[in-house]
Amino acid sequence: MKETGGSIVNLSSVAGIIGDASSLAYCASKGAVRLLTKSAALHCARARYGIRVNSVHPSFAETPMVLDGIARARDPERLRAGLERASPMGRMGKAEEVANTILFLASDESSFTTGAEFMVDGGLTAQ
């Protein structure tokens, strides 16, 4: 990749940005992805490798991991409603919305983007 350039897109989470008292290890690991991304972006840019490194930080999206967690809850409808209320847009994200952000970052359309954090969170971190 050093010779040809390219794009690395790391998948993190808003939990690496805002934290959650009930998910300490998860938040720490996602925060580490955030800083790994920034450090790798600087390294690759300064070395002139032509490699862009960015991160995507989704909030609750309708993915197998999230949907399974909702299904296992004591009151799935209540949990889902709470997650939807937490989003300024009033809904959970869709896996395709996260995927489209990743596709953009992997494409040449983002050729001057490196070290960036993309929140796909319906405005959650804007609050």
What does each model-found stretch correspond to?
Residues 9, 53-56, 66, 115, ...:
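Hydrophobic structural elements of the Rossmann-like NAD(P)H-binding subdomain
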Residues 13:
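Residue(s) in the substrate-gating loop at a strand-loop-helix junction
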Residues 18, 63, 102-103, 110, ...:
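Short C-terminal tail/terminal secondary-structure segment
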Residues 18-24, 90, 108:
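Active-site loop immediately N-terminal to the catalytic Tyr-X3-Lys motif
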Residues 29, 37:
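Active-site helix of classical SDR
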Residues 42-46, 111:
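Alpha-helical segment proximal to the catalytic Tyr-Lys
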Residues 60-86:
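A glycine/serine/threonine-rich, flexible loop-to-helix segment
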Residues 87-98, 109:
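A conserved structural motif in NAD(P)-dependent oxidoreductases
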